[in-house]
Design a protein with these regions (language model features):
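Chalcogenol-based redox active-site neighborhoods
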Residues: 1-145
Length: 145
């Protein structure tokens, strides 16, 4: 599962979601059954975003009221960007309902002036599964929102 601040936002759309979709077969070859994208958005927005990006392998999980995100301790205020309450970026490897590994972006805070994206990416999770270190974030895709 990976969580991100919002559908149709630049980093989420140009890199975070597309890269997990690109690497799906490789994740599968390392024993991952399903990749889930979670965002504090409603189901209609998540559906249209997935359709717009053409994702094929990602289960889109809306957390419309932020309940799951709040219980994970990852709900942050992003009113400085006009977003309201959103999820902080993180990814986690879950095996039989047990979190085995979690990558949380640095500088966790309400109204964070930046949008850190250096550890919840698909390449970092893949490197963890391979028992190596991440080569870094993949280049973003073009995104027209």
């Amino acid at each position: 599962l990976f969580a991100l601040p919002g559908a149709f936002t630049p980093t989420c759309s140009s890199n975070h979601l597309p890269r997990y979709d690109e690497l799906f077969e490789e994740f599968k070859s390392h024993g991952v059954d399903q990749i889930i994208c979670l965002s504090v958005n409603d189901a209609f927005v998540m559906f249209q975003w997935s359709k717009h990006l053409g994702t094929k392998n990602i289960f889109m999980l809306p957390d419309g009221n932020g309940e799951f995100t709040r219980k994970m301790g990852m709900l942050v205020e992003k009113s400085n960007l006009g977003f309201g309450m959103r999820s902080w970026r993180y990814s986690m490897l879950v095996n039989d309902m047990v979190i085995e590994k979690m990558f949380v972006e640095p500088d966790f805070a309400d109204n964070c002036p930046t949008d850190p994206f250096q550890s919840s990416d698909a390449d970092t999770m893949m490197a963890f599964l391979k028992g190596s270190t991440s080569p870094g974030i993949a280049k973003p895709h073009a995104f027209v929102g």
